[in-house]
Amino acid sequence: MMGSMAFRFLLWLVGLGAWVGPASGPNPLRLVEEDLAQRCDRVRHCGPGELAQRLLQLEPVALFDTRSAQEFEISHIPGAIRVDPSIPAGEFRRSFGDLAAGRDVVFYCSVGVRSTALAQRLQNAACVIGAKSVCNLSGGLFRWHNEERALVSHGRSAKTVHPFDDYWARFLKPAA
């Protein structure tokens, strides 16, 4: 089953790459966001502004970064916890149940592909442990960075984001 899912994911990425084409115009990342929202309409997508507001108001949010350890080391959103995007639902409940209970759970990755898949897969598990809601950060860390929001690495302010690869790097604004 996982092989089949990985193959479908690869086909989706190839199709998206052909559809989006070169990064040009005012906001090519928006096309990726819109495509994800349409393909995964069972997952709620929240924008960086909404998440930033919740974090500023100290609302209880369980924030999970679904990128690789290497990507997370370079920078992440303050307060985020790295979680493997292939984590089984039972392991997620055991490892993060206390943290997620009574909170809104937000997943993010570079642009939203991995985090949307995980949010969709873990929605039921999160509800079972008492999470208030589950959402994907629309545009992921790339949009967060492009809007010049706070990033950290090892407890210090960070300015750069791991580009994932050359294809996805074109969706990042250069660090100021």
PLM features per residue range, with description:
Residues 110-116:
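Gly/Ser/Thr-rich loops at beta-strand to alpha-helix junctions
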Residues 66-67, 85-86, 108-110:
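Active-site-proximal beta-strand/loop segments in catalytic clefts of secreted hydrolases
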Residues 62, 104-106:
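Structural motif
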Residues 51, 62-67:
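Short hydrophobic beta-strand that contains or immediately precedes a catalytic carboxylate
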Residues 4-49, 73-104, 116-176:
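Rhodanese-like catalytic fold shared by cysteine-dependent sulfurtransferases
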Residues 68-69, 114:
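Alpha-helix capping/helix-boundary segments
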